[in-house]
């Protein structure tokens, strides 16, 4: 199963980072290709994502489920769509009173025919999406930090 992980720090208290990261609509709008997030309940949501691979693109519904949420520590989730399974964990570590380290780990897997070949493609796409998503999150958090009094 292809995996990607990115770690970065932001100059914000952990409580501010946590508050932002648990807002699925706010975070969802930063995910590359996300066209909207529908909150179903405290643990479940549907993310409409436009996936592109070369000249082909398709909008899919990813059904996301929060498996575990420990305040100011971690969020564990899974998301599925037909033959696509993803899972991830976001961990938060207090570096200082005003700085937080965020680690984003994601795994993706395609089921069905030609799984091995599809996983090769998914591995590349996962890296691209992860870098874009974490860059957008870091920029938004840094903007938030610069806007605080």
Task: Label every PLM stretch briefly.
Residues 80-128:
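Beta-strand/loop substructures that line and gate deep hydrophobic ligand-binding cavities in soluble
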Residues 13, 42, 71, 95-99:
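Short strand-connecting beta-turns/loops that link adjacent beta-strands
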Residues 3-4, 50-51, 94-101, 105-107, ...:
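Extended beta-strand/beta-hairpin segments
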Residues 1-44:
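Hydrophobic ligand-binding cavity/cleft-lining segments
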Residues 3-5, 59-63, 84-89:
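Short, surface-exposed coil-to-beta transition loops
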Residues 126, 130-145:
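Short amphipathic alpha-helical signal-transduction/dimerization elements
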Residues 17-21, 27, 45-47, 66, ...:
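Hydrophobic pocket/interface hotspot
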Residues 38-81, 136, 148:
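Glycine-rich portal/gate segments that line the openings of hydrophobic small-molecule binding cavities
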